[in-house]
């Protein structure tokens, strides 16, 4: 059966739910799909909680990661929504997942207020460049005391302001559970939330005019069709039958041709910046490509092993290191979708770097990574984020 073609009429926006575990991120995601399905039945499918909660597992370096993608539409926009699980072990996914957001819904339980993971997710959203955060104050049906809710709202606004997010962002009181149960008052609250999402998350500035680049997130084989490489197009446009290069991690550059582009299992003539797509690549075996590489327009991006970066090292309170590090520190540098070990050289006159410090460092990676100036990275130790930074200068 031929696949349905995907019509590109409305603005396409990538969003996600972030926040503390058990504050109701997944329940809210389910409630949004149900409420929008009931509001615009011809535009939306409803997704049950357990469909979203049983997110497909991705195993990444020994950690099982779950991430769920759903799509839905309001009158104004088409949304792709990632539900990022809340455990500290899954910060990795926050980094891969949150990097895919044009805006985020921060879910905070009105019964609890901001918790450690709430702060961690907001900090991470800042690090990975999420442009906008608005707030769903969930479980609002369980708090009768108006003053208590106002207090929680104030705390959340302070938290956003502390990371340079919009302090005046919408804070919408919702009850995801009651909305799922069809309680009219709370169904309306979710409609209000989505109206706020439509209004407050800016139309993404799509980077369609830049040369094509897509970080590889996954690679698999489709019997009879060949190898498919999936990821979110970071910039530019890819058309069927265009030549590309696969760059980074390995010593040689692989050249190939894209013979098909698909999104949400629908065929497209092209994929463009911001789209989560699968690219069918000609003459490439599954083992020829791996996560951490990038697919690019030929000749536009080169892999590098040495760079200078400006970094922030998390304080102990933010879940970072408890002790300073010195010259020749060897953490992992997390670029786009993968970790690469690197050796750090501190600036002259700097003996050590304390948790909570900002500093400039020079780094020598053990594998090449496709990079440009301005590229963001996380610094990690055994899967735990201990710092964040951006490339300021490429050396080699």
UniProtKB/Swiss-Prot annotation:
Q: Where is this region: G1?
A: 19-26
What are the GO cellular component annotations?
cytosol
Record keywords: Cell membrane included? no
| Localisation | Cytoplasm
Q: Which Gene3D superfamilies match?
A: P-loop containing nucleotide triphosphate hydrolases (3.40.50.300), Translation factors (2.40.30.10)
Protein biosynthesis: is it a keyword of this entry? yes
Instruction: Give the UniProt family note.
Output: Belongs to the TRAFAC class translation factor GTPase superfamily. Classic translation factor GTPase family. EF-Tu/EF-1A subfamily.
Assembly, per entry: Monomer.
- The protein here is known as Elongation factor Tu
């Amino acid at each position: 059966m031929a696949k349905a073609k995907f019509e590109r009429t409305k603005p396409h926006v990538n969003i996600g739910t972030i926040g503390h575990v058990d504050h109701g991120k997944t329940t809210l995601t389910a409630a949004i799909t149900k409420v929008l399905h009931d509001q615009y039945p011809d535009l939306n499918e409803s997704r049950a909680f357990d469909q979203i909660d049983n997110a497909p597992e991705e195993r990444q370096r020994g950690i099982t990661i779950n991430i769920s993608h759903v799509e839905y539409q309001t009158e104004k926009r088409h949304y792709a929504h990632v539900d990022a699980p809340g455990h500290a072990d899954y910060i990795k996914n926050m980094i891969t997942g949150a990097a895919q957001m044009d805006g985020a819904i921060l879910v905070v339980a009105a019964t609890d207020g901001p918790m450690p993971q709430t702060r961690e997710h907001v900090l991470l959203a800042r690090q990975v460049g999420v442009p906008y955060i608005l707030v769903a104050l969930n479980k609002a049906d369980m708090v009768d005391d108006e003053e208590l809710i106002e207090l929680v709202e104030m705390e959340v606004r302070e938290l956003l302001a502390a990371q340079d997010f919009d302090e005046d962002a919408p804070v919408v009181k919702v009850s995801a559970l009651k909305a799922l149960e069809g309680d009219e008052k709370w169904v309306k609250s979710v409609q209000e939330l989505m109206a706020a999402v439509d209004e407050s998350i800016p139309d993404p500035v799509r980077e369609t005019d830049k040369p094509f680049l897509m970080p590889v997130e996954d690679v698999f084989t489709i019997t009879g069709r060949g190898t498919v490489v999936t990821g979110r197009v970071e910039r530019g446009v890819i058309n069927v039958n265009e030549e590309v290069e696969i760059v980074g991690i390995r010593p040689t550059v692989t050249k190939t041709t894209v013979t098909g582009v698909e999104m949400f299992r629908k065929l497209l003539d092209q994929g463009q910046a911001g789209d989560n797509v699968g690219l069918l690549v000609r003459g490439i075996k599954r083992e020829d490509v791996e996560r951490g590489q990038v697919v690019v327009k030929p000749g536009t991006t080169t892999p590098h092993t040495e760079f200078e970066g400006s970094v922030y090292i998390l304080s102990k309170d933010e879940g970072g290191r408890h002790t300073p590090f010195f010259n020749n520190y060897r953490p992992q540098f997390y670029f786009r979708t993968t970790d690469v070990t690197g050796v750090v050289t501190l600036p002259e006159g700097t003996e050590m770097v304390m948790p909570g410090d900002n500093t400039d460092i020079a780094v020598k990676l053990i594998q090449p990574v496709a990079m440009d100036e301005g590229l963001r990275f996380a610094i990690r130790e055994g899967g735990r984020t201990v710092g964040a930074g951006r490339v300021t200068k490429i050396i080699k």
